[in-house]
Amino acid sequence: VGFKAGVKDYKLTYYTPDYETKDTDILAAFRVSPQPGVPPEEAGAAVAAESSTGTWTTVWTDGLTSLDRYKGRCYHIEPVAGEENQYIAYVAYPLDLFEEGSVTNMFTSIVGNVFGFKALRALRLEDLRIPPAYAKTFQGPPHGIQVERDKLNKYGRPLLGCTIKPKLGLSAKNYGRAVYECLRGGLDFTKDDENVNSQPFMRWRDRFLFCAEAIYKAQAETGEIKGHYLNATAGTCEEMIKRAVFARELGVPIVMHDYLTGGFTANTSLAHYCRDNGLLLHIHRAMHAVIDRQKNHGIHFRVLAKALRMSGGDHIHSGTVVGKLEGEREITLGFVDLLRDDFIEKDRSRGIYFTQDWVSLPGVLPVASGGIHVWHMPALTEIFGDDSVLQFGGGTLGHPWGNAPGAVANRVALEACVQARNEGRDLAREGNEIIREASKWSPELAAA
């Protein structure tokens, strides 16, 4: 058979409905919206081709490799219920297409090029199945949930945090003071805002020093281990590591990184440094909505969450669930479990397209943050359970009596909810009552 040039249909090569997926394949679920007149099989096959071995035409060099061994395959297509001309295309990628231990390379391959494809109106990556063989090439979170609890000596309850506000404009000294008040009042952690890096009004080194002072003072006075997420995010990887090194020299327990704006390569480097040096790593997802907000285009956050667990982080922001729609709650809990658990069953009602086995990669604590306050505490305790970080920014600093009483109010509310739950009370039904009872004993909570 001679070599035959020319453009050909992708589906002839890349649509293989009878393919049996291998345990080592990376599986992807894409939400495909084809252009009018493009059949779904062709659209699904085009995605498989462009994100693996294909190009728009047959090339002579195809004969020098084994396409069967290296090509992505669209092995199943199903229409999306209730949506016109929208399909879920399942694609299987051979493991050899990806560099070991590189989230960066995985994304470059799977989502690098296909999203601008002419034959598609829109494309969204809904889920990825990471095979154990690939997961094992990643270090993952620097420490994970269990090690973090042992380091902090805090068990049987969610952890409490607070983002220091106003996020921009405070001097380092005043910033450290706010940190001290919150930790002294009863929080476990305070947090640099994601856009606090090293600006003219507060350089990073000054902030690190005053926050460390606040941590040590609060620890001495409360007898509890405290932390402040020192944001090490910087303009270069070298500068980021320099800040992490300084944090380690100060002896603080945790640093922070913006993993999407900072990039996966920088994040993985920082995660490796953190494991080697006993630092916990808090991850903020600034920029995620740019990627995950559109329902029919982009990447679903559950994929970004899986990628973070592979790249490495001990905490990650994951939405609050409270006050959102019922469906959102199930979807959010789906990726919260993907972050924490070792083995997660496929469950389409929670948006989980594939069974995921993490083979003992450490878990990540989900962080609920943004617009929550003490009256949400029962719901948050019930929804997220013990393995979570609950962050009240304005909900702490907005207390009429100040920061420390705001922290006291949150801690009292949390302890009351945990105690009530352990006594078998129904937090969903009696939540407000539980908070009201607790506020009889805590003027700070009553004032909140």
From Swiss-Prot:
Substrate binds at N113, T163, K167, R285, H317, S369. InterPro entries: RuBisCO, RuBisCo_large_chain_AS, RuBisCO_lsu_C, RuBisCO_lsu_C_sf, RuBisCO_lsu_fd_N, RuBisCO_lsu_N_sf, RuBisCO_lsuI. Keywords: Calvin cycle, Carbon dioxide fixation, Chloroplast, Disulfide bond, Lyase, Magnesium, Metal-binding, Methylation, Monooxygenase, Oxidoreductase, Photorespiration, Photosynthesis, Plastid. Binds 1 Mg(2+) ion per subunit. The modification N6-carboxylysine is found at K191. Its EC number is 4.1.1.39. Pfam families: RuBisCO_large (PF00016), RuBisCO_large_N (PF02788). The gene is rbcL. Transmembrane segments: none annotated. Its main location: plastid. GO terms for molecular function: magnesium ion binding; monooxygenase activity; ribulose-bisphosphate carboxylase activity. The keyword Transit peptide does not apply. One of its GO terms (cellular component) is chloroplast. This is Ribulose bisphosphate carboxylase large chain.
